[in-house]
Swiss-Prot record:
Stored NCBIfam families: polynuc_phos, PRK11824.1
PROSITE patterns in alphabetical order: KH_TYPE_1, S1
UniProt entry keywords in alphabetical sequence: Cytoplasm, Magnesium, Metal-binding, Nucleotidyltransferase, RNA-binding, Transferase
Organism expressing this protein natively: Carboxydothermus hydrogenoformans (strain ATCC BAA-161 / DSM 6008 / Z-2901)
Record-given protein name: Polyribonucleotide nucleotidyltransferase
Single Gene Ontology MF annotation: RNA binding
Length: 731
């Protein structure tokens, strides 16, 4: 087909499937656009940027949008409106995955707005669209005029039967103990995100290394793609980023401010200032210095503030590298003081308060019925979720004022990380048939709140009596590297988060890692450094676990009296209609009468949730009566409900809640061993009689027999009782 356009297509085999990039075919008005195909998964990724830098900001304004389209999986959106609306949590997490490895690869001082849009057009579940989007974003930026210092590549690494697998299929992913996303450049790993089933540190390092080997192939492929695109006019020359050095200003500020800031930091360490005292002290000093320098350089307020922040960062880094002392006086491997508490809230199902230094998280567990699961309406194959963790970060936790308008991307990301850390220890539905929701409320924040949420949630789960596989703890780590000097920091706080070269969060049990999130900002982080960092993180994790287990060593044996009790039973799937009734009439009546929640699965599993145990047992009894099978050949004590000329109707299973019981017909010929002229001669309405189930007629109606329930010998004896002759005397 002739398009009249220059089109470039190129592909590479990754994990046995073709990864194809197409440029020049669609969305050509964007600065960079690529159609990425990985198997049958297709994603359009575009990159655009503003012509001028944004004034008055001190950050890089990058926005990433990940747009899910339901047509990609042949679905129409649910709900009334029938079109896509706000991004799902999965879409937000995918956007964060794209953002994190590319953000550090723009020049310092670049302030132009950059917008990445990844639109999912077609999905084959074996080829995850978020990985295609990550590689597509890298390619689109590489083709654009934007000063991107990439490209990067991205893959997923799984662990199936102790073998590392690149980009596992859905079938392999179900068996995998690891889901590890690795993104990086030719020279360095930039980002790692993992969920794992207690995977040891050494295997995690091996998986990261294996993933980076595959990433290098993708990076080389994108570089070749750009070279060919340039020849066809499908790639643009990179723009120059001119950042005025202002050497004279920097020299003047540094000369005066460095000794003053160093002295201030020494004082903070010596007198053990807390976060508020430290922030106030440093801000006041920097404000005084800024005011002074503005007299000479009145147009340079932002620049002066930036120089002062850089000086502060450098002093704190050097203090750590040269002396091994952090700004709060701790050693590099030291964890802040910890205290924990459980059972704070009397009416909740479980609660845990975790405090580490000036980071404090209150986690609350709620147990629900099977029907309380979250219904998922996205592009994935999962339809529901029975374990949820939600994270809230109110402004008061950092002493700030700002409007509260629901969870932002950061809160969704932190909540998902903690959920991923805890999920491997949550008992399966067969063992613990509850829906579990945890909410972590950040009450104080000075770094590492997501890992604090993991710890608080573990305490709350054990307080709630959830039989978790093992307790989980998490710790946030940092790395500072200059040349050959390296310092690894355990349990970083807020001020240390921004000044490091790598920050990573590790959660797990005593046996292995359950979640890992790592962002690396520099090249040269070797395998040895990663190994040492994860080993130090394990030491910190074990210390934290020890403190938690001092408060509660195992899950409680009993649930909260306010938690629902779930009674489980199974019935023949054919009997489900007997429980539900026409238009749901019967099940509604059971629920109204007992106050329970009833969830019925298509396979016949029934879950009854009731706070009152007696109510649950009452509902179970009703269901058992409704579904009770009448066994042919068995004798029942029944009640005569109606008399007809041709026989008597007998109820063998009594009705409940005004609902009919189960009855059958005793035909007149089955009433007695002798001939019966009138039914009333043998039984009357209201009589209780023994009957035997003898089968069903061709319409499925139960047939009963009274005579078969009474042996003929017994009947004869009643008609002709034996004559007892009097004994003769003397005999």
């Amino acid at each position: 087909m002739t398009t009249g356009r220059q089109i470039l297509e190129k592909e590479i085999m990754i994990a046995g499937r073709p990864l194809k990039l197409t440029a020049g075919k669609v969305a050509t008005q964007a600065s960079g656009s690529v159609l990425v195909s990985y198997g049958d998964t297709v994603v359009l990724v575009t990159a655009t940027g503003s012509k001028e830098p944004r004034e008055g900001i001190d950050f890089f304004p990058l926005t990433v949008d990940y747009e899910e389209r339901f047509y990609a999986v042949g679905k129409i959106p649910g709900g009334f409106i029938k079109r896509e609306g706000r991004p799902s949590e999965k879409a937000i997490l995918s956007a964060r995955l794209i953002d994190r490895p590319i953000r550090p690869l723009f020049p310092k001082g670049f302030k132009n707005d950059v917008h990445i849009v990844a639109t999912v057009l077609s999905v084959n579940q074996d080829n995850p669209p978020e990985i295609a989007a990550m590689n597509g974003a890298s390619a689109a930026l590489t083709l654009s005029h934007l000063p991107f210092l990439g490209p990067i590549g991205a893959v997923v690494v799984g662990l199936v039967e102790d073998e590392l697998v690149i980009n596992p299929t859905i079938e392999q992913a179900e068996k995998s103990r690891l889901h590890l996303v690795v993104a990086g450049t030719r020279d360095a790993v930039m980002m790692v995100e993992a969920g794992a089933q207690e995977v040891p540190e050494e295997i995690m390092i091996e998986a990261i290394t294996r993933g980076h080997e595959e990433v290098k192939k993708i990076v080389a492929f994108i570089e070749e793609f750009r070279e060919e695109a340039l020849k066809l006019g499908l790639a643009k020359e990179k723009m120059e980023v001119v950042v005025e050095e202002k050497a004279e200003l920097k020299e003047a500020v540094t000369a005066e401010a460095y000794p003053l800031l160093k002295e201030a930091i020494e004082k903070i360490i010596a007198e053990k200032f807390n976060k508020q005292e430290r922030d106030e002290y440093l801000e006041n000093l920097k404000k005084e210095l800024t005011t002074k320098f503005l007299e000479t350089y009145p147009e340079e307020e932002l620049t002066i503030k930036g120089i002062l922040d850089s000086i502060q960062k450098e002093i704190v880094r050097q203090k750590i590298l040269k002396e091994g002392i952090r700004i709060d006086g701790r050693k590099t491997d030291e964890v802040r003081p910890i205290w924990c508490e459980v059972g704070l809230l009397p009416r909740t199902h479980g609660s845990g308060l975790f405090t580490r230094g000036q980071t404090q998280v209150l986690s609350i567990v709620t147990l629900g019925a099977v029907g309380d699961v979250q219904i998922l309406d996205d592009l994935g194959i999962e339809e529901s979720k029975r374990f949820m963790h939600h994270y809230n970060f109110p402004p008061y936790s950092v002493g700030e004022v700002r409007p509260m308008r629901g969870p932002g991307r950061r809160e969704i990301g932190h909540g998902a990380l903690a959920e991923r850390a805890l999920e491997p220890v949550i008992p399966p539905e067969e063992v613990f048939p509850y829906t579990i929701r945890i909410v972590s409320e950040v009450l104080e924040s000075n770094g590492s709140t997501s890992m604090g949420s993991v710890c608080g949630s573990t305490l709350a789960l054990m307080d709630a009596g959830v039989p978790i596989k093992a307790p989980v703890a998490g710790v946030a780590m940092g790395l500072i590297k200059e040349g050959d000097e390296v310092a690894i920091l355990t349990d970083i706080q807020g001020i240390e988060d921004a000044l490091g070269d790598m920050d990573f969060k590790v959660a797990g049990t005593k046996d292995g890692i359950t979640a890992l999130q790592m962002d690396i900002k520099i090249a040269g982080v070797t395998r040895d450094i990663l190994t040492k960092a994860l080993a130090q993180a394990r030491e910190g994790r074990m210390h934290i676990l020890g403190k938690m287990l001092e408060v509660i060593s195992e899950p409680r044996k009993e649930l909260s009296p306010y938690a629902p009790r779930i009674i489980f039973t199974t019935v023949d799937p054919e009997k489900i209609r007997d429980i539900i009734g026409p238009g749901g009439k019967i099940i509604k009546k059971i629920i109204d009468e007992t106050g329970v929640k009833i969830d019925i699965e298509d396979d016949g599993r029934i879950f009854i949730a009731a706070v009152d145990k007696e109510a649950g047992e009452k509902a179970l009894n009703i269901i058992e009566n409704l579904t009770k099978e009448i066994e042919v050949g068995k004798v029942y004590l029944g009640k005569v409900t109606r008399i007809a000329d041709f026989g008597a109707f007998v109820e063998v299973v009594p009705g409940v809640l005004g609902l009919p019981g189960k009855e059958g017909l005793v035909h007149i010929s089955q009433l007695a061993h002798s001939r019966v002229k009138r039914v009333e001669d043998v039984v009357k309405e209201g009589d209780q009689i023994l009957v035997k189930a003898i089968g069903y007629d061709n319409q499925g109606r139960l047939k009963l027999s009274r005579k078969d329930a009474i042996p003929a010998e017994e009947v004869r004896e009643k008609k002709n009782p034996p004559i007892h002759k009097p004994r003769r005397e003397g005999k």
